Structure formats: structure tokens, C-alpha cells
Amino acid sequence: MSSLAFNYIVNLLSHREYSEFELRNKMQEKNFSEEEIDEALSRCQAKNWQSDRRFSENYLNSRAQKGYGVGRIRQELRQLKGVSSDIIDEVLMESEIDWYEMAENLLRKKFPNYNEQQTPKMKQKIWQYMLSHGFRSDEFADLIGQNQSEWD
């Protein structure tokens, strides 16, 4: 095994967590062979220095703190980070995040003056904002109908 490949991965992992997909891409950019990549990754995973599950848990918590919902986080993990759907599903099921409460807090923060007499245009703007942040309509639709006194 190439100690250069192994040392490269260890150096990357010493700074932050990476998904296996991200590490593979970085190593391919440095022109390591597939064999070197596989061996170095296997060694790091055997030592539990790299784990897609742990990466996903950390990523979920980080993105949730920034106000993103399940849909957006799931999409990013799958498409951008290359994490398997099985791992994503497990991590989301074990998460103790209250997505409804998060949607409510995000709505209050972004639209503090909202009340149910708002124009349809404003309701559409809120709807689009929440969907773009990865919340399902059932997580925020009834919040749009709440009156201002419930937000205070």
C-alpha cells in the first residue's frame, strides 16, 4: 500500500470529517490509483477514522442548526456527499430533531411580522422559502394559518 495515499487521507481527516465519496474524489484529483485509494480508505475505516454514518450525523446537525429541513439535507447528503440512502435514512430516523419546531422557529425568524391576513403573494413567498429550505408542506402549512398572537 502506498503510504503517501494513506498519509494524504489522514491529513485530510485531521482537519474535518469527510464522506468516502469526497475522499475518493480528492484522491482521484491527486492521481492516486483506485487500488491505492481503496487500500487507504479501508485502513482508515478499519480504524474508524472515516465513517459515512458519523459524517452524516455531523452534517445533519450542522445543516439543521442553519435552518435546513429534512428534504434539503437528504438531497445534499445523497447528491453532493455521496452517502448511501440507507445510512441517510438511519441517521434521520435516529435524529431527535423536532422538525416542526424548527420550521416554526425559522418562519418566525425570517418573517417576524407575518399574520394570517397577509396577501396571497406573501403566503406564496413564505411557502417557497420553506420548501427551498427542505421543509415538507405538512411541517409548515398550518403555521401559515396561525395568527400573530401565537407567534409572540
Curated annotation (Swiss-Prot):
Domain of life of the native organism: Bacteria
Keyword Repressor listed: no
Principal place of residence: cytoplasm
Gene Ontology cellular component terms for the protein in this record: cytoplasm
Coiled coil: none
Record key words, sorted: Cytoplasm
Pfam entry (one): RecX_HTH2
Annotated GO biological process: regulation of DNA repair
Subcellular location per the Swiss-Prot or TrEMBL entry: Cytoplasm
Keyword tRNA-binding set for record: no
InterPro entries, per the entry: RecX_HTH_1st, RecX_HTH_2nd, RecX_HTH_3rd, Regulatory_RecX, WH-like_DNA-bd_sf
Physiological role: Modulates RecA activity.
Similarity field: Belongs to the RecX family.
Matching NCBIfam families: PRK00117.3-3
The protein's name in its UniProt record: Regulatory protein RecX
Gene name of the record: recX
